[in-house]
């Protein structure tokens, strides 16, 4: 009996060992990086549908090197149209196209473990399987055009399904765009959820903190939303801002709202100003309650009250602050208090928002490591001297791990309606705008100055040391050692492509990916693609270019920044995950050898 158990166990271990060996020798997954989507849902959906220009590159990798760019473009166009058409220049018939498509699919599916048969629609699944296996198929497949055309349709569908294995989003679904909800629904949908890795951005932290119940972040979230007149977003999320709107329009005359308010509607402008004042009052309370944050320089209301009291308002562009008590400027008026308390409760209990943010709290992280890459939104806090900056007793990887624990705990309390810790809620405020936050990276967020001070020099928000340090070999080596990685991928900071700036450092260790989805950055958005053969950046098309390309059924114009090329396709065994799998394989092999030794001893006895 013992011998039978031993043999059964050897069989189980052998199967596990073979699965690990297969995975180790599989190609790394083709991965897309995108960052800073900034609420631009339609543009994101459009570019995602086109797979960020990956179709041409995949066809190029999967087909013989003798194929001209024109021939590859012709085949890619058929995939997009899902329909064969003749081209006198290329002289390829339906059979030629079918065999090329099979070759592309075989390239993507060979040495890959993360595929399943769902990439094929059921009608031609068996036929495609035979073609991939090199088995004969019935003659009508090639001889009857109506059947060939349907097969080309199904092959085109399958090719689009296998273009992309993983999507790494580097944060900031929220900001100035009106459709963050659309983006989250796409990323969390059954079609994409299992292939998405998400790291938080500072604007995500803002909304997450507001939903958890941080008072100042509730005011700030709504202030930014009103600043861009995104009332449809608030309506879709079922927020009731009628009381706020009535108070704002009654309290703040539009002609007196002369600060740098951006809302285009009178209603939005009044609400923006009302929320700005409420936000500053709530921030002052939090900063005073948590002096160890060292943010006392952000306390402006005492100074504002003194200006208003003495009439020395020449530095200001706006002096209409009817709800500020000059003797106690950070005190909320009775009506402000009632309004913000109602809004806080709406944020905490809003089921529509909770459905969206569940994806962040449960699936998101402060950083993510894959294929020897560290993925972060903005930075790892560092000092002028190139050391890791300490915050609350933590630094480097330990700091990001600590923040992750707080976010996860806060998220669980939020999702299951449990009481929150005041310290945890306050931390979200610091993560949003504190100088040592891994999501921000500047010495201060100058919201007050930009709204109300005439002197533009005081509006400047100076970046700290991350960008400079990431140009230093010593700091890059420090990052590699701290996280056990080879490259660092980060977003948050736009890369000005129009001025000739590059995404990657010369050695390819530091790569700055910013999707440029905010309207101000439409001409400098980037994505990053890693295939088993290449690592390259894509300069994304503008919305106008996307529309014109869709009409012509052609790819939008893309510029490529090649970062690295690999003579042999990269395998899982070449990655950090592969090293862990190799350790697991060695343990299993040790057990198998132990059982084998026991069997030999048993035979001898």
UniProtKB/Swiss-Prot annotation:
EC class of the enzyme, as a word: hydrolase
Domain of life of the native organism: Bacteria
Alphabetical list of InterPro entries matching this protein: FBPtase_class3, Metallo-depent_PP-like
Cofactor: Mn(2+)
UniProt-listed Pfam families: FBPase_2
Pathway info: Carbohydrate biosynthesis; gluconeogenesis
Record keywords, A-Z: Carbohydrate metabolism, Hydrolase, Manganese
GO biological process, one term: gluconeogenesis
Reaction(s) this enzyme catalyzes, per UniProt: beta-D-fructose 1,6-bisphosphate + H2O = beta-D-fructose 6-phosphate + phosphate
Transmembrane segments: none
Molecular function terms, GO-annotated: fructose 1,6-bisphosphate 1-phosphatase activity
EC number: 3.1.3.11
HAMAP family: FBPase_class3
Entry's family note: Belongs to the FBPase class 3 family.
Name under which the protein is recorded: Fructose-1,6-bisphosphatase class 3
Annotated organism of origin: Desulfotalea psychrophila (strain LSv54 / DSM 12343)
Gene that produces this protein: fbp
